[in-house]
């Protein structure tokens, strides 16, 4: 032990138990150490000692752990394992709202006295499901999960022992453990896909959970320490089958506090059930039971507080009634139970009259009569045995009177007997329901939950406290043996050297209680004596036990003869003997028992029979035990057959022995519940109270056992990653750089570290997988590491500062040299500059004078030259003007001469055209009359129509040719214009050259004439070229004008022809209307004849009204473009079948060839009527055998490539409706809808995204068609023709129901698909967003390559996988033409899901809450944000706010209150509870200071003040459905025609034939 100045330690305190201190002085004088301690309250304490290393010296303070370890999750990891360290760790965690702490194999649960629903939510259950203990923070769910997994994997029964004093939270803990098992079973059933099993198990689980409110109502009461205190012990076995599914349960109860029924101390209550029936029973029932209010009953008004704050007895009554019904208690039986309970209250009000020596009770006493009436017993006999007793001897029965006190005891005894019997009967009834013979045959394993009272000691301790402490002695002994066994097993498993660990054995105390001459045996012996009393029993105890060897654990008090003292494992307890004998007897008189057996209340009769059966089983158990003892002793002593009523003590002993046998046969887990204060105040921590409970519940004993061995255990990797710096780098650097690292390399490095740091090899042991350390070694290593790091930091700082200041010096030196050089250079440059300026001035003067003279001479010469050039220019211009005027005159003459004959020609041409027009008009009129005469013939009309159309086509072609020729002429014109521009540019060049030549003439007079002549020749030639071009341009312009006029004439003729055709059609419309009715009648008759043939063969005569009234209006076009019938003939049949009308129409029905149409209808009807083949082909071949087209960046899919299944279905459905096959269509659609949903349900793997999007697009297409059909039917009057109102309404109803069906299908497959996407995303998101470290250079320490090289396993995902996932969704939905609104909804839902599940996972991972992890998280989320921005979701970040703000929180400072306030402002999306959780779990790096405890307390206080129970949940709740269908908000697709496209790889012969037949309806008119 080291006590240098500055050492932190603990010093005893009367007020707080222990108080923190610091060594401020440590002097050694004359072999004595004089230490001065400064306590946290500034008090100074002096300590003197001879030896600082003597750990057993009580004067020495206890060493305190480093701050980073003070709030550890497992107390056994503390470096200094002592009482104050344990207490302080629990207190620190409690102040941070962490109520659970591990202490080795024990879970310590500190009652918060506050609602903590968020700790037990379904999200929390899922967080712990499948996790190993210690993987996430302590929780009772971790204990439950460990028990469940051990039972499942090791096939071994488990027990969870929940203990603690009243008010510590045992009942709540046991209840949530049961809920966890039920949830695990439900999850297990769901994973196995056994839906029926899940449904069945849910009922069993509900029944098991229903036992809680029943047991609480009949066995719990309000005490001074607890508002819901269990007044009995309970061991519940949850039974599992071979598949580890819950199939039932069994319950055992121990030592119900019967005296509470008749007596309650101040501020306490009776059992809850009495207050519940008074508050919840209907008024008429209460009148029948003669019930009023609690204050009117003696058994309920003694405590004085009939109500509990915050508890509604009416609602609790409803819960109890529901639970009773659930476990099989019939309503009639419930009424009988209430009668019994009411009778007990009335029994308590029976007034017994007191006489001098006796007591009396009239059979007419009102309360007695009511009680007997409710119990169904005789009031006279019942009253008799309240005031009398009967003693049975061998020869006679002696009846004597009871005094007043004895009569009260008799009255209360019968009440306690009835209530106890009722309680036991309820337990038996529950066991019968939850563990019937069918369940017994299936039991494979069980998990037992023991909810039992903790060690109790009060000012007055009676029989109940004695039994409770006896049970705790047995449990503590088993606990100590279990802890020792686990320690021993681990040492053996790791193959380390170990020595026997001594621990306090409480076997002497147990022997004192249960030996043949022990306390219980003497108590039973005294209880069987008629004159037995507490005083005589006490004397027997003193005489028998107050001597060796029992006097070590038994003693009598210094004063008085009414108590005895037992030295329990926790402390010595003095028991008051008053009432021991009476409570142990716990019997009712034989007279009362006979009266009760004669009851007319069937339920009470059943209860009494159950009591007798239980007593018989106890006697048989005792006989079996006695006979086995005789066999062991090998003495053939006869067993006396004496029938005795079992005492309460003997019954409790036997049940406790049975319980211990059960526990010893199972693997045990321990939960110790701690009550932090006596006032039940939320989040208040009383040091002394908690300390006493830690001592009593064996936690400190566990720690002492651990300290005696090797309490600290580190894996090799953890040890190296933490302490490798304690040896030189040359030792560990090669290991980290080694690629083929082995586990032996790791072990060797550990040995090197230990050899270099620890001299005493007894302080550690190296096992197979761990290193075991003695207590205090962890602090030793931390001190070495801190010293090493501090020296390294100093060294680094020294070198950094040295380099910095050297650099500064060198910079200053270089600066001085540079300054000198600059100064000298400046002086020299100034001198040189002056000389240069002098030289420049002289040179400027010289140059200026020369320039001035040259400028004057040049000006004179220039003036002369300009004068000469101007004169020459004027002469030349006059000559050019003369030539221009001459040429203009010639041009005017030629044009005038050409105008006169052209005008004459045009006049003649116009006259000729007029004549031709008149002749053509006369011919046209003649033809028109002929057409009118032949109009009566439909075939002639068709020919005329075709000729006119051909004429239109011919004229169109001519017009196109003319337009093409015009375009060529325009192109030629543009070329000529370009030539003119070129010529103009050439002329400009010549002009420029001419000017240059003129200037040259002034210097070269002699060559002027020749050059001028040459230029003139060139100019004349250029002018000729210009004239030629102009002439050609004029010719082309005239030709273009002529052709334009001709084109206009042809266009006019085309318009006239179209007008003529329109007039012809208008005139023929009258003829159409005349034959329309005949035509309709003919078509109807022929169709009927054809269908009559079919029905004759099938003996079915369906009603088929005309098809134009059956389907939505709007004729179908042969293709998307306008194609004439003649053109349609040349189209191949496959192409013609590609485009089909929505309703099956082809061209106008008036021109369909009747015979061909009849044949088509016959075959279509036959194919559609027999739906079995068609349904099977559509289901198996189309819907199940579909192929999804590839989607991606470079792939452009047409709509027909995507929705081909929908369009095929639409065609089939349309034809069914056209023929009136409504029943067949309903069957067909039902199978289609079911199959599509099944197909989507089975999607998985790489097919999930494309196939899901594919079916979303197809179902949307089908739904749009149905909406279109419904709208057409309801808005167009033509649909009512050919149908009566009944048929029309039936058709409307069919389409309306179909619309609803498709709405449901769209909703279902969207939900199924989205849930599957979430499930797929769940596997990837956490690894990719939370775990993966994509940002280089900021890898967290827990992801060190050392750990990954050896122990890395499992599938890993990165952000690239997540982005690929979202990219696949984007491209599939885009390629499949799914609306953007739907894509946006899907992505937003998935982003919210990623945000939720990643946050929920992150908040439970302690090691991931560091600033480096914050950087990595921020980087990963940023990549997701960028993807959203580039894919049309700029607001994607708002759906990832929790992750974004968590990343910010991890990177921000958190060391002051101002920092916390700033964090709260930035992280506005996080609740106070979430902020507190993240900050308290923040993983401090080696170079960071721990967050101060006062800051953590400040954050916790914010949660207490600002949060409500609804906002305390640290988890986000993912939106997992049901989801709203986003297609509801999107407009349906438009329908004009359906393109029937059947891919070549589909084998659908019947479907293809139907499509071909429908397509032939388009080509029939041209046949």
Swiss-Prot record:
User: Where is the segment annotated Disordered?
Assistant: 619-640
InterPro entries (UniProt xref)? Dilute_dom (IPR002710), Fungal_Myo2/2A_CBD (IPR046943), IQ_motif_EF-hand-BS (IPR000048), Kinesin_motor_dom_sf (IPR036961), Myosin_head_motor_dom-like (IPR001609), Myosin_N (IPR004009), MYSc_Myo5 (IPR036103), P-loop_NTPase (IPR027417)
GO cellular component assignments: actin filament bundle; cellular bud neck; cellular bud tip; filamentous actin; fungal-type vacuole membrane; incipient cellular bud site; mating projection tip; meiotic nuclear membrane microtubule tethering complex
GO terms, molecular function: actin filament binding; ATP binding; calmodulin binding; microfilament motor activity; small GTPase binding
> Which parts of the sequence belong to the Dilute domain?
1230-1505
Keywords annotated in UniProt:
Actin-binding, ATP-binding, Cell cycle, Coiled coil, Motor protein, Myosin, Nucleotide-binding, Protein transport, Repeat, Transport
Q: Myosin N-terminal SH3-like domain: which residues?
A: 4-57
Concerning CDD domains, the annotation shows:
fMyo2p_CBD, MYSc_Myo5
Oligomeric state and interaction partners are given as: Homodimer. Interacts with calmodulin (CMD1) and the myosin light chain MLC1 through its IQ repeats.
List the PANTHER family hit by this protein, alphabetically: DILUTE CLASS UNCONVENTIONAL MYOSIN, ISOFORM C, MYOSIN
Q: Which family does it belong to?
A: Belongs to the TRAFAC class myosin-kinesin ATPase superfamily. Myosin family.
From the Swiss-Prot or TrEMBL record, give the protein name: Myosin-2A
| Species of provenance | Naumovozyma castellii
């Amino acid at each position: 032990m080291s006590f240098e100045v500055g050492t932190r330690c603990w010093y005893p305190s009367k007020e707080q138990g222990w108080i923190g201190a610091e060594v401020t002085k440590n002097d050694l004088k004359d072999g004595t150490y004089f230490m001065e301690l400064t306590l946290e309250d500034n008090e100074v304490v002096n300590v003197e000692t001879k030896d600082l290393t003597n750990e057993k010296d009580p004067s020495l303070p206890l060493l305190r752990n480093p701050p980073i370890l003070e709030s550890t999750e497992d107390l056994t990891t503390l470096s200094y394992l002592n009482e104050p360290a344990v207490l302080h760790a629990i207190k620190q965690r409690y102040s941070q709202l962490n109520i659970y702490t591990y202490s080795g194999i024990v879970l310590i649960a500190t009652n918060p006295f506050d609602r903590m629903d968020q700790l037990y939510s379904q999200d929390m259950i899922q967080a712990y499901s499948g996790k190993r203990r210690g993987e996430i923070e302590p929780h009772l769910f971790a204990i439950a999960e460990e028990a469940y997994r051990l039972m499942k994997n090791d096939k071994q029964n488990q027990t969870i022992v929940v203990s603690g004093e009243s008010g510590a939270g045992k009942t709540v803990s046991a209840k949530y453990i049961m809920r966890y098992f039920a949830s695990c079973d439900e999850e297990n059933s769901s994973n196995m896909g056994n839906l029926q099993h899940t449904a069945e198990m849910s009922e069993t689980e509900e029944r098991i959970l229903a036992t809680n409110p029943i047991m609480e109502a009949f066995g719990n009461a309000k005490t001074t320490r607890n508002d819901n205190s269990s007044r009995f012990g309970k061991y519940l076995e949850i039974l599992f089958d071979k598949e580890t599914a819950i199939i039932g349960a069994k319950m055992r109860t121990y030592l119900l506090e019967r005296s509470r029924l008749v007596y309650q101390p101040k501020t306490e209550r009776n059992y809850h059930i009495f207050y519940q029936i008074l508050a919840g029973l209907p008024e008429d029932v209460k009148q029948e039971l003669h019930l009023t209010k609690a204050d009117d009953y003696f058994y309920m008004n003694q405590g004085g507080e009939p109500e509990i704050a915050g508890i509604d007895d009416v609602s609790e009554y409803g819960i109890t009634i529901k639970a009773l019904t659930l476990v099989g208690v019939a309503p009639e039986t419930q009424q009988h139970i209430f009668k019994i309970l009411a009778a007990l209250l009335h029994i308590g009000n029976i007034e017994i009259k007191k006489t001098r020596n006796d007591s009396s009770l009239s059979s007419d006493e009102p309360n007695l009569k009511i009680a007997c009436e409710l119990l169904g017993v005789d009031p006279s006999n019942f009253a008799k045995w309240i005031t009398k007793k009967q003693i049975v001897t061998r020869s006679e029965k002696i009846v004597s009177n009871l005094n007043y006190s004895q009569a009260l005891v008799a009255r209360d005894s019968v009440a306690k007997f009835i209530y106890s019997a009722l309680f036991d009967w309820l337990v038996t009834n529950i066991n019968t329901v939850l563990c019937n013979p069918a369940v017994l045959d299936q039991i494979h394993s069980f998990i037992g939950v023991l909810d039992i009272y903790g060690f109790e000691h009060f000012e007055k301790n009676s029989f109940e406290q004695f039994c409770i402490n006896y049970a705790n002695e047995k449990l503590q002994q088993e606990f100590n043996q279990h802890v020792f066994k686990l320690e021993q097993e681990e040492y053996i498993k790791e193959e380390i050297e170990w020595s026997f660990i001594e621990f306090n054995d409480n076997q002497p105390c147990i022997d004192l209680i249960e030996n043949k001459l022990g306390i219980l045996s003497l108590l039973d012996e005294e209880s069987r004596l008629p004159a037995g009393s507490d005083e005589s029993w006490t004397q027997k105890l003193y005489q028998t036990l107050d001597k060796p060897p029992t006097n070590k654990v038994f003693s009598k008090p210094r004063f008085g003869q009414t108590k005895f003292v037992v030295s329990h494992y926790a402390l010595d307890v003095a028991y008051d003997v008053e009432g021991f004998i009476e409570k142990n007897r716990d019997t009712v008189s034989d007279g009362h028992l006979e009266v009760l057996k004669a009851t007319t209340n069937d339920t009470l009769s059943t209860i009494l029979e159950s009591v007798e059966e239980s007593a018989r089983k106890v006697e048989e158990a005792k006989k079996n035990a006695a006979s086995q003892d005789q066999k062991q002793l090998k003495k053939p002593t006869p067993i006396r057959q004496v029938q005795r009523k079992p005492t309460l003590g003997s019954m409790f002993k036997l049940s406790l022995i049975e319980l211990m046998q059960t526990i010893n046969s199972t693997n045990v887990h321990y939960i110790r519940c701690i009550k932090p204060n006596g006032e039940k105040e939320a989040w208040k921590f009383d040091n002394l109270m908690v300390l006493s409970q830690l001592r009593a519940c064996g936690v400190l004993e566990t720690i002492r056992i651990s300290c005696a061995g090797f309490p600290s255990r580190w894996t090799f990797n953890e040890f190296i990653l933490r302490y490798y710096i304690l040896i030189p780098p040359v030792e560990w650097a090669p290991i980290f750089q080694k690629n083929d690292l082995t586990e032996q390399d790791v072990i060797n490095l550990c040995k090197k570290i230990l050899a270099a740091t620890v001299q005493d090899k007894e302080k550690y042991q190296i096992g197979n997988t761990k290193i075991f350390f003695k207590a205090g070694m962890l602090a030793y290593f931390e001190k070495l590491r801190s010293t090493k790091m501090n020296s390294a930091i100093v060294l680094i700082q020294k070198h950094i500062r040295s380099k910095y200041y050297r650099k500064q010096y060198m910079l200053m030196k270089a600066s001085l040299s540079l300054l000198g050089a600059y100064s000298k250079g400046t002086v020299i440059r100034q001198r040189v500059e002056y000389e240069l300026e002098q030289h420049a001035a002289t040179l400027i003067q010289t140059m200026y004078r020369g320039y001035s003279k040259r400028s004057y001479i040049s000006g004179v010469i220039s003036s002369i030259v300009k004068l000469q050039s101007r004169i020459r220019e004027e002469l030349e211009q006059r000559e050019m003007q003369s030539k221009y005027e001459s040429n203009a005159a010639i041009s005017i003459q030629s044009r005038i001469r050409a105008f006169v004959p052209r005008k004459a020609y045009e006049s003649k041409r116009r006259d000729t055209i007029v004549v031709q027009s008149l002749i053509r008009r006369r011919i046209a009129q003649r033809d028109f009359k002929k057409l009118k005469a032949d109009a009566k013939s439909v075939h002639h009309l068709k020919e005329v129509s075709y000729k006119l159309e051909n004429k239109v086509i011919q004229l169109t072609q001519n017009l196109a040719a003319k337009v093409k020729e015009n375009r060529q002429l325009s192109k030629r014109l543009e070329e000529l214009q370009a030539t003119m521009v070129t010529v103009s540019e050439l002329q400009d060049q010549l002009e420029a050259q001419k000017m240059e030549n003129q200037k040259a003439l002034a210097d070269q007079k002699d060559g002027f004439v020749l050059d001028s002549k040459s230029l003139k020749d060139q100019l004349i030639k250029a002018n000729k070229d210009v004239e030629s071009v102009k002439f050609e341009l004029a010719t082309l312009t005239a030709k273009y004008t002529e052709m334009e006029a001709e084109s206009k004439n042809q266009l006019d003729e085309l318009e006239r022809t179209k007008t003529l055709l329109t007039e012809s059609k208008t005139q023929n419309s009258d003829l159409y209307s005349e034959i329309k009715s005949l035509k309709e009648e003919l078509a109807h008759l022929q169709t009927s004849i054809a269908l009559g043939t079919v029905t004759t063969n099938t003996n079915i005569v369906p009603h088929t009204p005309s098809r134009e009234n059956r389907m939505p209006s709007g004729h179908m076009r042969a293709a998307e473009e306008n194609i004439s019938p003649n053109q349609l003939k040349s189209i191949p049949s496959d192409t013609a079948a590609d485009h089909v009308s929505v309703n099956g129409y082809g061209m106008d029905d008036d021109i369909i060839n009747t015979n061909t149409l009849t044949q088509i209808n016959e075959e279509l009807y036959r194919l559609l009527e027999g739906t079995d083949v068609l349904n099977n082909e559509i289901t198996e071949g189309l819907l199940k055998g579909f192929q999804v087209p590839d989607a991606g960046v470079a792939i452009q899919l047409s709509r027909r490539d995507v929705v081909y299944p929908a369009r095929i279905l639409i065609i089939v459905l349309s034809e069914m409706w056209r023929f009136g096959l409504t029943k067949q269509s309903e069957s067909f659609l039902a199978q289609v809808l079911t199959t599509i949903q099944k197909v989507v349900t089975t999607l998985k793997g790489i097919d999930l995204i494309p196939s899901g999007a594919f079916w979303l697009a197809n179902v949307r297409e089908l739904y749009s068609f149905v909406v279109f059909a419904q709208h057409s039917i309801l808005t167009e009057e033509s649909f009512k023709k050919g149908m009566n109102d009944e048929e029309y309404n039936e058709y409307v109803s069919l389409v309306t129901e179909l619309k609803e069906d498709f709405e449901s299908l769209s909703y279902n497959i969207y939900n199924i698909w989205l849930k599957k996407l979430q499930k797929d995303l769940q596997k990837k998101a956490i690894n990719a967003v939370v775990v993966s470290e994509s940002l280089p250079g900021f890898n967290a320490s827990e992801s060190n390559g050392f750990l990954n090289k050896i122990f890395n396993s499992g599938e890993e995902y990165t952000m690239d996988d997540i982005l690929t996932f979202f990219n696949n969704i984007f491209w599939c939905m885009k390629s499949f033409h799914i609306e953007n609104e739907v894509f946006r909804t899907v992505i937003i839902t998935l982003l919210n899901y990623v945000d939720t599940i990643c946050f929920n996972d992150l908040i439970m991972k302690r090691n991931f809450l560091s600033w480096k992890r914050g950087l990595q998280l921020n980087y990963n989320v940023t990549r997701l944000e960028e993807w959203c921005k580039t894919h049309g979701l700029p607001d994607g970040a708002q759906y990832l706010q929790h992750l974004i703000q968590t990343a910010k929180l991890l990177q921000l400072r958190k060391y002051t209150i101002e920092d916390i306030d700033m964090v709260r402002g930035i992280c506005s999306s996080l609740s106070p509870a979430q902020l507190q959780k993240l900050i308290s779990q923040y993983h401090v790096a080696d170079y960071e200071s721990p967050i101060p405890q006062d800051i953590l307390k400040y954050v916790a206080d914010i949660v207490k003040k600002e949060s409500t129970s609804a906002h305390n949940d640290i988890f986000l709740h993912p939106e997992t459905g049901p989801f709203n269908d986003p297609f509801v908000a999107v407009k349906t697709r438009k329908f004009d025609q359906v393109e029937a496209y059947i891919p070549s790889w589909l084998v659908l012969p019947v479907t293809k034939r139907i499509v071909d037949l429908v397509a032939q309806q388009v080509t029939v008119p041209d046949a």
